Each structure stands twice: as structure tokens, then as C-alpha cells.
């Protein structure tokens, strides 16, 4: 299913921390705030710059890859990509054949933190991450971000333990696009958790839709020891 997001922006907070039970939240990491020890501060004006900053943090000064990342990151986003959204709105089904656009965090466990600034993320994928706490306000648009050709999910967690997905706001409208797989670009879900992911917390997340799409898609065998209910508007209920 292709879906369109009206032009909008939202702040994102993404923090990776050591696993510790949080008494106040019931999650797998604390939300006491503060900066991770040794964190490097960066500023990004585009999604590509965010991707480049994360890639650079995975190698040392000699260019050698460091397991788990070379240092924690604090990334402040100061850009705005609303113009790309407006352009894509004119040709929704034409976005599917393009390369996916999104932020992927792969084998990075040092910690990443995005202060809440005006920004829009198209798609987030966490692959082989550990002890990752995601706490954010985010709006996703899969059709516009050209994500569905590879995997049609707004947020996808693969083979990653101790993950907390919190305070997500995902807007979606369904579009049938003839000539794509199943005529709906094989969109699966807003949140896809699979491939050995364990100890996953999903909480206080809202999905606004024009017509019903899957809220979450869970692949077994894996353990979700804490799966807290999404807060859904009435319009989303079947």
C-alpha cells in the first residue's frame, strides 16, 4: 500500500543506552536525560548528512571499522525536506521504483541521540543493534521516501535485543498502484519486528490513517517480553 503524508515536520529523539530497568517507564533503559560519556556532537542539515555522520562514527581515525561504533553521537538536525514531500505528492505511485530513502543504524551500539528539532524522517531501520532506546516524535511517509521496493515498513527492527520504540506518530493513506507487487507495493506494517529481536518495548505510539493498514507485524520465534499497547485514535479501529 502506498501512502502519503501531508507536508509536516516533527522532532525526533533517538537515544541508545546501556540496558537497565526503568522503574518509571517499564522499559529497558532509563530516560533520565544527560549526555553519553565521550559523545561527539554533530550538526546535520539533511538526511544524507545524518547517514554520513553515523557511517563516520563506525570507524577510527585510521579508517578501520570499530565493532559497535567508535564513539557515541549527538546529532542536531537543522534542515527541512518539506520540498521533497511536496514534489513526491504529485506522483505517488512513481516513488515505488526509486531507491529507498531512510536512516539505517547497523551494528552500532555506542549510542545515538537526536535532540528534538524540526525534522522529518522517512524510514528507520535498526539491524544488529544492541541496547538501543528509541524515544522520539516522528512522522513517516513510505510512499514519499521510496521505501516499499525493499521493505515496506516505517520502522523495522532486525536481530536487535533491548529495543524501546516510544512516542511515534505515523500518518498514512493507502494508495493502490497498478503494476507493483500485489498492486499495493507490498507494504507490510508501521512497525516490523523480526529476525531474532528480543526484549522489545512498543509504547505510546499513534498511527493516523485514512484507511486501515497494519499497525505492527511480528515474526516468531522471538521474545517480546514487554509489548505495551499503542494509543490509537478511533478512526484507526476496524
Curated annotation (Swiss-Prot):
Q: Which reaction does it catalyse?
A: Eliminative cleavage of (1->4)-alpha-D-galacturonan to give oligosaccharides with 4-deoxy-alpha-D-galact-4-enuronosyl groups at their non-reducing ends
Give the enzyme's main class according to its UniProt record, as a single word.
lyase
Q: Which residues form the signal peptide?
A: 1-22
- What is the top-level taxon of the source organism? Bacteria
Which gene name does the record give?
PEL X
Q: Where does Ca(2+) bind?
A: 153, 188, 192
Recorded protein name is Putative pectate lyase X
Recorded GO MF terms: metal ion binding; pectate lyase activity
* The organism's taxonomic lineage, starting at the top: Bacteria, Pseudomonadati, Pseudomonadota, Gammaproteobacteria, Enterobacterales
What organism does the record attribute this protein to? Pectobacterium carotovorum (Erwinia carotovora)
Q: Which cofactor does it need?
A: Ca(2+)
- Keyword terms: Calcium, Lyase, Metal-binding, Signal
User: What remark does the entry make about the cofactor?
Assistant: Binds 1 Ca(2+) ion per subunit.
The text of the family note is: Belongs to the polysaccharide lyase 1 family.
Chain segments annotated as transmembrane = none
The record's annotation in Gene3D superfamilies points to: Single-stranded right-handed beta-helix, Pectin lyase-like
Amino acid at each position: 500500500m502506498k501512502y502519503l503524508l501531508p507536508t509536516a515536520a516533527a522532532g525526533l529523539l533517538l537515544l541508545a543506552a546501556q540496558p537497565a530497568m526503568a522503574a518509571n517507564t517499564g522499559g529497558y533503559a532509563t530516560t533520565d536525560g544527560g549526555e553519553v560519556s565521550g559523545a561527539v556532537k554533530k550538526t546535520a542539515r539533511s538526511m544524507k548528512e545524518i547517514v554520513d555522520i553515523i557511517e563516520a562514527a563506525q570507524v577510527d581515525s585510521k579508517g578501520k571499522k570499530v565493532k559497535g561504533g567508535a564513539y557515541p553521537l549527538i546529532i542536531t538536525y537543522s534542515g527541512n525536506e518539506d520540498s521533497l514531500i511536496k514534489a513526491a505528492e504529485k506522483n505517488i505511485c512513481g516513488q515505488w521504483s526509486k531507491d529507498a530513502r531512510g536512516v539505517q543504524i547497523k551494528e552500532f551500539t555506542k549510542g545515538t541521540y537526536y535532540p528534538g528539532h524540526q525534522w522529518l524522517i522517512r524510514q528507520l531501520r535498526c539491524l544488529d543493534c544492541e541496547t538501543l532506546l528509541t524515544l522520539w516524535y516522528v512522522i513517516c511517509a513510505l510512499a514519499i521516501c521510496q521505501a516499499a521496493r525493499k521493505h515496506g515498513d516505517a520502522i523495522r527492527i532486525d536481530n536487535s535485543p533491548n529495543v524501546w520504540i516510544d512516542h511515534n506518530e505515523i500518518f498514512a493513506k493507502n494508495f493502490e498502484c497498478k503494476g507493483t507487487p500485489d498492486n499495493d507495493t507490498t507494504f507490510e506494517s508501521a512497525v516490523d519486528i523480526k529476525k531474532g529481536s528480543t526484549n522489545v518495548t512498543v509504547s505510546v505510539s499513534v498511527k493516523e490513517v485514512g484507511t486501515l493498514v497494519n499497525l505492527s507485524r511480528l515474526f516468531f520465534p522471538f521474545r517480546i517480553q514487554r509489548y505495551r499497547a499503542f494509543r490509537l485514535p478511533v478512526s484507526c479501529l476496524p
